[in-house]
């Protein structure tokens, strides 16, 4: 039921009815703003179903405010990951079309796959390509990706792809190292067994599992300074 009537107690100890409406809780996984003239910051807190659309809208806002963007910081710190197709899409927003984003490899034939920066690898059934709304300049704007020990899974896929293709400078601390693929094998009507069946690999073939992504520039998060300094050099 969408509505729920629940009794409550008042401060006088008397009960009274309260109607609770059930609604979907929508969390905002993308934030961003122009930090200073020519430079912007966009943060992804996780990779959800709405993340790609929200990312595109935020980039549109940034370029409307600052059409001559000189540099962008993509902040993936403490982003635990999420959906693989969202990670492929975010990577594709910055990379040339059809280059490799990530691959999986395991002992079984079905665990071997390659995911490229192409709509067929991130579009959902019946949906259009949101990346078509992005300004062409996003493919070449100087880019810094911020990561730390809390960046995992999908975050590491994005950071690894942008690093391997030399599209961005990755800055921060070594990432978590969550690069395994789990598959659930049904055992009965109500039971199943989750097995690790493959690992994720960056475009150059580096395993993400346990090793994570090592930044190009190692930075202590407590250190003073600005990531925009790397964009200006």
Regions found by a protein language model. Give the residues of each.
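Short, intrinsically disordered/low-complexity patches at protein termini
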Residues: 65, 108-109, 126, 194-195, ...
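Generic secondary-structure microfeatures
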Residues: 147, 197-199
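Conserved functional hotspot residues or short segments at active or partner-binding sites
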Residues: 192, 199-233
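Cleft-lining beta-strand/loop regions that shape enzyme active-site pockets
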Residues: 1-188
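A generic structural signal for well-ordered coil/turn residues at beta-strand boundaries
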Residues: 14-16, 38, 189, 194-196, ...
């Amino acid at each position: 039921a969408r509505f729920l009537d629940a009794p409550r107690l008042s401060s006088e100890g008397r009960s009274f009815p309260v109607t609770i409406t059930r609604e979907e809780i929508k969390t905002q996984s993308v934030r961003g703003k122009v930090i200073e003239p020519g430079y912007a910051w966009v943060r992804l807190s996780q990779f959800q179903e709405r993340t790609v659309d929200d990312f595109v809208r935020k980039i549109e806002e940034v370029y409307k405010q600052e059409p001559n963007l000189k540099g962008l910081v993509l902040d993936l710190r403490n982003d635990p990951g999420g959906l693989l197709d969202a990670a492929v899409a975010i990577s594709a927003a910055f990379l040339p079309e059809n280059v490799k984003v990530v691959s999986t490899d395991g002992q079984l034939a079905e665990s071997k796959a390659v995911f490229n920066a192409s709509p067929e690898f991130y579009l959902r059934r019946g949906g259009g390509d949101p990346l078509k709304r992005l300004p062409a300049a996003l493919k070449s704007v100087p880019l810094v990706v911020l990561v730390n020990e809390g960046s995992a899974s999908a975050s590491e896929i994005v950071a690894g792809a942008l690093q391997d293709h030399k599209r961005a400078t990755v800055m921060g601390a070594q990432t978590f190292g969550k690069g395994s693929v789990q598959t659930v094998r049904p055992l009965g009507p109500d039971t199943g067994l989750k097995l690790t069946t493959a690992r994720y690999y960056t475009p150059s073939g580096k395993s993400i599992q346990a090793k994570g992504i090592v930044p190009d520039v190692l930075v202590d998060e407590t250190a003073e300074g600005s990531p925009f300094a790397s964009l200006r050099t």
